[in-house]
Amino acid sequence: MDPVKNCSFTGNHLGIQPHSFVEIVEMLADDCETITGIRPKTPFNEKGHEILFITPSGDVFADPGIYTFMGYLMLFHELDLDYTFSTYASEGGNFGSFTTFNMAKKLNAKMYAEAERLGAKWILGGECGHMWRVINQYMATYNGPAPSCMMDVPTSPITGTKFTNAAATKMVHITEFTADLIKHNKLNLDPSRNDHIITTFHDSCNPARGMGLLEEPRYVLKAVCNNFVEMPENTIREQTFCCGAGSGLNTEEIMELRMRSGMPRGNALRYVQEKYGVNHMACVCAIDRATLPPLADYWAPGVTVSGVHELVANALVMKGECKRTMDLRQEDLPNVTAEAEEE
């Protein structure tokens, strides 16, 4: 119950105070500058922006989610996106959905309340699982309709695309937004920067079965990675397997149970690792980014886990960036290593 209490009182499940939230994001912006030579802007609680961005707090406080968050910062800076963060609605995940209807409704209400307070026209949401189950299936009846006096049907300021699927909730998933950018050739991408990985994609239960978000993440991954491999068809999309540790089961005390319950996903991952040399698995869920690394270490040692937008930022060629020699984890890029060997 502590995560639920923390979300209610301080805005995120870890109970991190607003000033600490700001400091952590600023630190991640510093890391972006180390890698690219460009320090992305980090607007907090600013009124009058078109977009309010809300993401799971695991992307701010936990490895490997922090690299996904750095990807957001770099993408938004490159687009010069008119957006703001909120330190009060600083948790996209709805931990109330694990407890009671009333608590889930209360936590979800903060999204609209902050959008109204800050004057945002629509909300862009980060990579999360149960966050999007609640938004897609329940938000319109929990706390809708959205404040129609000031919120619009989400429209990309970059491409002009109207996200009519979000007309009721006024919220768009980040992979929908990025897939639209790529479709309209609005990003300068160099997928060779991800040539050190052969990646597959884990369909997180809530976005896949609870939302139908199946094609957009794959469209993005194929644009930013030259080496993408699907796991067997009866283990992905609507037939995906659970990570084995969602719904509050991500604790060290039940690690054996987690490894057993995650075995179907681990088995599918090991299959593509042995057959195709897969060494990376992307996903669009913060809980998965926390639970899948130990599962991969156990069932398919050598496979790393990341969010989709970490790989987007690796491939993103930013205007005015320095010569990129490192990926977001500050590890050498493959093309840089090859150039050094040639010299």
How would you name each of these model-derived features?
Residues 257-279, 290:
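A short, acidic, amphipathic alpha-helical segment used as a generic capping/interface helix at domain edges
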Residues 55-60, 88-98, 102, 106, ...:
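Local cysteine-cluster metal-coordination motifs and their immediate loop/turn environment
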Residues 147-191, 233-238, 297-335:
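Short, flexible loop segments at boundaries between secondary-structure elements
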Residues 73-86, 183-187, 196-257:
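Redox- and metal-dependent alpha/beta enzyme cores, enriched for Fe-S-associated oxidoreductases
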Residues 1-156, 160, 329-343:
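Iron-sulfur-cluster electron-transfer modules
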Residues 1, 248-262, 290-303:
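Iron-sulfur (Fe-S) cluster-binding segments and ferredoxin-like electron-carrier domains
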Residues 138-144, 221, 292-299:
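Short, aromatic/basic amphipathic alpha-helical patches
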Residues 104-107, 186-201, 248-261, 323-343:
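A polyampholytic, Gly/Pro-enriched intrinsically disordered region
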